[in-house]
């Protein structure tokens, strides 16, 4: 179960990526969940990731999604 701070961070990431990718939050969630990025990277690495800036996070996760073969 996620703690409130982790859940807040995930929501922040979903919205930031949605704005950058011109997608809805549910569409972004589906991509991150289906690729394992949500659980295996964003949530697992919360302690480090939450200290980074929005622009860096968006670029980093966008690149990671593309490495998984999904165009965003």
Q: Residues of each region from the PLM?
A:
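N-terminal acidic leader/helix
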Residues: 2-27
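Short amphipathic alpha-helical segments, especially helix-boundary/capping motifs
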Residues: 1-6, 35-39
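Amphipathic, hydrophobic secondary-structure cores in small proteins
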Residues: 18, 24-49
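Long, compositionally biased
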Residues: 46-72
């Amino acid at each position: 179960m996620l703690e409130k701070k982790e859940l807040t961070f995930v929501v922040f990431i979903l919205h930031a990526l949605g704005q950058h990718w011109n997608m809805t939050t549910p569409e972004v969630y589906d991509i991150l969940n289906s690729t394992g990025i949500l659980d295996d990277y964003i949530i697992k690495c919360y302690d480090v990731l939450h200290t980074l800036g929005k622009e860096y996070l968006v670029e980093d996760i966008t690149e990671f999604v593309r490495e998984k073969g999904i165009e965003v």
